[in-house]
Swiss-Prot record:
The lineage of its organism: Eukaryota, Fungi, Dikarya, Ascomycota, Taphrinomycotina. GO terms for biological process: cytoplasmic translation; threonyl-tRNA aminoacylation. This is Threonine--tRNA ligase, cytoplasmic. CDD domains: TGS_ThrRS, ThrRS_anticodon, ThrRS_core. One of its GO terms (cellular component) is mitochondrion. The keyword Nucleotide-binding applies. It catalyses: tRNA(Thr) + L-threonine + ATP = L-threonyl-tRNA(Thr) + AMP + diphosphate + H(+). Residues 47-109 form the TGS domain. Its EC number is 6.1.1.3. Belongs to the class-II aminoacyl-tRNA synthetase family. Keywords: Aminoacyl-tRNA synthetase, ATP-binding, Cytoplasm, Ligase, Nucleotide-binding, Protein biosynthesis. It comes from Schizosaccharomyces pombe (strain 972 / ATCC 24843). One of its GO terms (molecular function) is threonine-tRNA ligase activity.
Length: 703
């Protein structure tokens, strides 16, 4: 783009009178290198190639000339207008980038996860262009996320972005969209990149640390913006029909509070305005359900800067926390798990043995004690390995299922901390199963049954995905992996649930099953995990006595042999803190009775009824019902309204009439007919009904 064109864009966007020097420098270098690229492209041999579509149809094309968008157009104009990205030989590919050889081709639109990711990534570049022109800022990173996209930037003089800036940013973005600026891809050497982004210390750091010397990577241009990016992108900015800035925040470069403070702007975009309106409706509902708001309004928990990332659970919040622990302990008891208690800190020698010190130490809190280095545990598995090894084990002892609610600490960057979903101090329903290879399938089936009961109780649906052996780096022999994967597949098939294969995405120490739950707003959360581990039993030299075969016994004169157990990592809730956040938003603060921190509120109609209210309160407390009594000076209607807003499951109004009949007037939170006037129930009967409802763990609030 020429200098005149740049000025034209700037003028049309906001009548900018001041040209931004680094923009022109970037464009001049881009134009020079693009000219060289086009000259080299012209020399590429044009040969006939076969392009195979997902349905098996083969289309003829020409190498270095035919593009995915031209293939889409040959099928239908509607398809060409709708698609956002191509998948060529399994890899994302720009629709306007020429195909280089015979290949497979898949075309994705916004409804495809990869298509949506590319759509939002391209939208992030539009946001980058808009903020750069708005604030003359130095851009940092601008990725797509699960819920849109964001861009981080450093702004001179410590300028902070506010809600008042949104309309200006959106105006620049809409002008860029209107101009249908093409996304242009260019490969540039590390040296060229350092020169192109010489003005931007954040890009300089990324280039220096992420790109090896002598290597190259890609940049993309749309309008005046050129950014370091691997792509791919939509053909042009006009594909984004609806664009909005959603929020802003401060962050730190690389998420580290020691680095520069940055401004982060979030956005959302869609291929049509209808989807934007639906999203805004969803957003309004999500805001009402935000666990941080509900936690504050219901006085469940809070955070304080004296201990970042560590939650203060207030009495009513602790009720939820302890109810979940009690529920999991009940499940453990009936499923053959044994609860253990392990230390919170260990000498680093343990973490060196487990491999965490080399691979995870930056996420651990460590300190020196008497010239020895120790670290707070970020996970329980090494400690459980020490337990397994503490005495001889026989195959008759297996499977050995151990559960641990120990406090864990992970040194998350302060900029990444977010309510209960990203914390530094937390507890997990962490368990490890040590079993023989032949027991893997039955143990996994047991985990599925566990999942089904717990998530069904919460009202969640869930999705299963099997991640198998990585192509290159993995521990153990192929036969062991193949057998383990076959057992996992058999267990998945027997579960009755649909599942997907994520080939090659397993951990290096074993295959895993990822479980994604869907909440009331259809949002996805990964909480549970089931992972097989061949590494830790090897690292800790874990072994058990296994019966020797007849041939082995004959050769050794011993009927026993030592062999390695398989270790299964298993969590259902995951972090209790994160699960409480998810449940808070899933129920919108209207807790099912069995889990509710406010099960009953007793409201005496006057001071004369206080003694009777206390009597009923004590009866309910002795029955292990969470009950509060409102003896405030508020009027009766005000007390009732306050209890309704606090989401008590039931309100018991008591006065002289109820005292004379040893009863309570019951109002049900979820029954509109009983909001203004409840029904009278004997205390003895209501206690029985409450206990029955609590035991049933029903999601329906009904006596």
């Amino acid at each position: 783009m020429s200098a005149a064109a740049v000025k034209g864009v700037q003028a049309s966007l906001d009548n900018l009178s001041l040209e931004i020097p680094f923009i022109q420098h970037r464009l001049d270098l881009f134009d020079k290198l693009q000219k060289e690229y086009k000259e080299s492209l012209a020399t590429k041999p044009r040969e006939e190639i076969d392009i195979t579509l997902p349905d098996g149809k083969v289309i003829k094309g020409t190498s270095w000339e035919t593009t995915p968008i031209s293939i889409a157009a040959s099928i239908s104009k509607g398809l060409a207008d709708r698609v956002t990205v191509a998948i060529v030989n399994g890899e994302p590919w720009d629709l306007t980038r020429p195909l280089e050889a015979s290949c497979t081709l898949k075309l994705c639109d916004f409804n495809d996860p990869e298509g949506k990711r590319v759509f939002w990534h391209s939208s992030a570049h539009i946001l980058g262009e808009a903020t750069e022109l708005s604030f003359h800022c130095h851009l940092c990173i601008g990725p797509p996320t699960d819920e849109g996209f964001f861009y981080e930037m450093g702004i001179d003089n410590g300028r902070v972005i506010t809600n008042d800036d949104y309309s200006s940013i959106e105006s620049y973005a809409k002008q860029a969209i209107k101009q249908k600026q093409p996304f242009e891809r260019l490969v540039i050497s590390k040296e060229g990149l350092l020169e192109m982004f010489r003005y931007n210390k954040y890009k300089q750091y990324i280039i220096q640390t992420k790109i090896p010397d002598g290597a190259s990577t890609t940049v993309y241009r749309c309008g005046p913006l050129i950014d370091l990016c691997t792509g791919p992108h939509v053909p042009h900015t006009g594909r984004i029909k609806s664009f909005a800035v959603t929020k802003n925040s401060s962050s730190y470069f690389l998420g580290d509070a020691k680095n520069d403070s940055l401004q982060r702007v979030y956005g959302i975009s869609f291929p049509d305005n209808k989807q934007m309106q639906e999203y805004k409706t969803f957003l309004a509902e999500a805001a009402k359900r935000d666990h941080r708001k509900i936690g504050r309004d219901q006085e469940l928990f809070f955070f304080n800067e004296i201990s970042p990332g560590s939650c203060f659970f207030l009495p009513h919040g602790a009720r939820i926390y302890n109810t979940l622990l009690k529920y999991m302990r009940y499940q453990y008891s009936k499923r053959g798990y044994q609860e253990v208690i392990t230390p919170n800190m260990y000498n680093v020698n343990l973490w060196k043995t487990s491999g965490h010190w080399n691979n995870y130490s930056e996420n651990m809190f460590s300190f020196d004690i008497e010239k020895e280095k120790y670290a707070l545990k970020p996970m329980n598995c090494p400690g459980h390995c020490v337990m397994f090894k503490s005495r001889d084990r026989s195959y008759r002892d297996l499977p050995w299922r151990v559960a641990d609610f120990g406090v864990l600490h992970r040194n998350e960057f302060s900029g990444a901390l977010s309510g209960l979903t990203r914390v530094r101090r937390f507890q997990q329903d962490d368990a490890h199963i040590f079993c023989t290879p032949d027991q893997v399938r039955s143990e996994i089936e047991g985990c599925f049954d566990f999942l089904k009961e717990v998530y069904g109780t919460f009202g969640f649906t869930f999705h299963l995905e099997l991640s198998t052996r990585p192509e290159e780096k993995y521990l153990g022999d192929l036969a062991t992996w193949d057998k383990a994967e076959a057992q996992l597949k058999a267990a998945l098939d027997a579960s009755g649930y649909k599942w997907e294969l994520n080939a090659g995405d397993g951990a290096f120490y074993g295959p895993k099953i990822d479980i994604t739950v869907f909440d009331a707003l259809k949002r996805q959360h990964q909480c549970a995990t089931i992972q097989l581990d061949f590494q830790l039993p090897e690292r800790f030299q874990l072994e058990f006595h296994a019966p020797a075969s007849a041939e082995e016994a004959k050769e050794s004169g011993n009927n026993n042999k030592y062999t390695r157990p398989v270790m299964v990592h298993r969590a259902i809730l995951g972090s209790l803190e994160r699960m409480i956040a998810i449940l808070t938003e899933h129920y919108a603060g209207k807790w099912p009775f069995w889990m509710s921190p406010r099960q009953v509120c007793i409201i005496p109609v006057s001071a004369a009824a206080y003694n009777y209210a206390d009597k009923v309160h004590n009866i309910l407390s002795e029955a292990d019902i969470f009950v509060d009594t409102d003896k405030s000076d508020n009027t009766l209607p005000k007390k009732i309204r306050n209890a309704q807003l606090a989401q008590y499951n039931f309100i018991f109004v008591v006065g002289a009439e109820e005292e004379s009949t040893n009863s309570v007037n019951v109002r049900n939170r979820d029954d509109p007919k009983k909001q203004s006037k409840g029904s009278t129930v004997a205390v003895e009967e209501v206690v029985k009904k409450l206990l029955k409802l609590k035991e049933s763990k029903s999601l329906i609030n009904d006596l």
